Amino acid sequence: MSDSPRPELVVDGLPGKKRPRWIELATSADHKDLGRILLCGALGFLFIALVELLLMRLQLAIPENTFLSPVTFNRMLSLCGASAIFLFAIPLALGLFYYLAPLQIGSRGTALPRLGQTGVALWVAGATVLYAGYLFTPSEAGVNPLAPLTELAFLANNGVDAWATATGLCTLGFVFIAIDLLTTLRNLRAPGMAWRRVPVFAWAATVSCWLLLVIGPVLLAALTMLMIDRNYDGIFFADGSGGAPLLWQHLSWIFYSGSYALILIFAFGAIAEIVSSFAGKPLFNRGVVMGSLVAIAVLGTLAWMQNMLTAPIGLGWMYFAMLMSLALIVPVGLIFFNLISTLVGGALRMRAPLLFAVGALSAISIGLGAEICHSMVAAAWELKNTTDSTAATHFALVGGAVFGGFAALH
């Protein structure tokens, strides 16, 4: 038997010396710290996207303006669109879900913390690649780069490759976070907390995670095919070589339509909690609201071809997309009715969260009302790809992501 001394205590780091806070935050697997990273990053990229948007509006303010060159404008548009969706709206929703949902169900942490940490790291890497690409050769193909514009014959630089890599890393990170959060909500609920007892915001997180698990791999598959086309002589989207440029539109719009629905689900989940709290009464028809969130996820994703009514698709598919878009009115209307019914007769406390929530409902109603017009086939042929269509989308997204997000943050 050896008489050599054994250590009494093994410590992580030097005794009496605490690591800096930023190192603790960067290496932590705690869901609250990871949620803070997503939230702080999302708000930072919101500011950057607003600056880019302001510069583009200054260019468009005067006819024949030379403030921005056409190439610079296209690059800024591509960067602003990617920042708004991949670096602000979805991370803001996931950050609040990741921070609050485990606490709402009585869990001390998440089920797969390292997977969630990897997801956040992938998102940070994607954001770095996107803006590092802007320093060299940024993408010039727009918010949703459509084939065959993305082929090497039209854009021979590496801008589209950088965009595809950045958005792919972000999307993969979102999928990892969704798996971790969904596993937590499924397995780590407090004893006796059945699904019908789960808070509405935690239920919105569950629906959003399922939605991300559906739409995320679709975009990853599309980005993989795009990279094969550009770098390994693939023909997935190559027109005239047996490829189908329209395939990119289908795959990408499935993701973007699902993301649109995800942002609305996040906003309605947060607003439902806020309205109930600041009205001083339980949420009216709580089960109907929870069911409507599921319906928004399903119908909002199935309506992806509503963005393609000016593309060469069959008339039957156009009517299918129109019907899915019009059917979306039902769950959204039910949620509005129940939220208003909760406010009526309540002891309202007009604080910042409730004011943001009411502003979000107003903006969402205007945006979705305009989207109803754009979902009609006859009107879409005239209004699609115009500033009116862009305004309708931005009304709903600003109402959901910005006002709804600020309401939840308060």
Language-model region placement:
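Membrane-embedded and interfacial regions of multi-pass energy-transducing membrane proteins
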Residues: 2-410
